[in-house]
Amino acid sequence: MADFFSTGPGIAVLIIAQCLAVLGFVMVSLLFLVYGDRKIWAAVQMRRGPNVVGAFGLLQTVADALKYVVKEVVVPAGADKPVFMLAPMTSFVLAMIAWAVIPFNDGWVLADINVAILYVFAVSSLEVYGVIMGGWASNSKYPFLGSLRSAAQMISYEVSIGLIIIGVILSTGSMNFSAIVAAQDGDFGFFSWYWLPHLPMVFLFFISALAETNRPPFDLPEAESELVAGYQVEYSSTPFLLFMAGEYIAIFLMCALITLLFFGGWLSPIPFLPDGPIWMVGKMAFFFFLFAMVKAIVPRYRYDQLMRLGWKVFLPFSLAWVVFVAFAAQFELFGGAYARWAIGG
């Protein structure tokens, strides 16, 4: 068996198996994310939420997915059908392939490349095309306005996210996620992680992630009171399901990025406890809980407030932080908190 996996076909089988394992993890997580999102929202509103299908309503997401799949796919008469059908697939596939460089433990990653951050940033930047394609191909004013809003919103907050990540790269000396986690490994456990020296950026990254993934209170591209459902107005059945799945997968990806960049990835918060993927998944679940709580509690922003926050507050502050981190890392200020080089030095 070992000889087989050293051959060309064996390596191909191994790669396919690894891809399917990551795909399976993300898809199973998706079921629990939707269920958890609905349960948290219901609890805040003093409702019960899903509670009929399966134990504690756990199979409600499966039932809803089956309902979408068996429904008829309705394409508007004036729509550009090829682009209309391609848009949700683009959104879903791009959200999935970003997971190729996300490690869950030391060595547990599909592609352990040195430019992993650039890869994720490039793929996430392309996700806006799925939304624009869906809005334009629908041949309707509400989807088109929603897609324009989404494009402006995602581009605005990608700039801030990029600058925040640059601060972490300057501290680490690497764009590899495993190296970034290794740089946070210290004798003080939880207090050795990057959340402490980069504390202001943790809050900025979290808020920018909400805007980047079109989550409340920044869900302006699909604001029901203004645009009915934004770029999703004309979609039904499986295409709508793909859009929603892509959105939740992108949210979970942001939870993974926060965990890897600032909260030690798979490292244990207590030094004498073993590290492992359970810590990684647990931290991601915690940040998704925060995403869901913000959705349930915070009212929606106006569009002008959203743009003003991104360009006049987040952008200058994150740019100033990059300069500060570069200066602190170069001269090893604050006890070398900003100069824990994983490579080079």
Swiss-Prot record:
It is a multi-pass membrane protein. The keyword Disulfide bond does not apply. It catalyses: a quinone + NADH + 5 H(+)(in) = a quinol + NAD(+) + 4 H(+)(out). Its EC number is 7.1.1.-. It is found in: Cell inner membrane. One of its GO terms (biological process) is aerobic respiration. PROSITE patterns: COMPLEX1_ND1_1 (PS00667), COMPLEX1_ND1_2 (PS00668). InterPro entries: NADH_UbQ_OxRdtase_su1/FPO, NADH_UbQ_OxRdtase_su1_CS. One of its GO terms (cellular component) is plasma membrane. Its main location: membrane. It is an enzyme of class 7 (translocase). Keywords: Cell inner membrane, Cell membrane, Membrane, NAD, Quinone, Translocase, Transmembrane, Transmembrane helix, Ubiquinone. Pfam families: NADHdh. Belongs to the complex I subunit 1 family. PANTHER family: NADH DEHYDROGENASE SUBUNIT 1, NADH-UBIQUINONE OXIDOREDUCTASE CHAIN 1. NDH-1 is composed of 14 different subunits. Subunits NuoA, H, J, K, L, M, N constitute the membrane sector of the complex. This is NADH-quinone oxidoreductase subunit H. It comes from Dinoroseobacter shibae (strain DSM 16493 / NCIMB 14021 / DFL 12). The lineage of its organism: Bacteria, Pseudomonadati, Pseudomonadota, Alphaproteobacteria, Rhodobacterales.
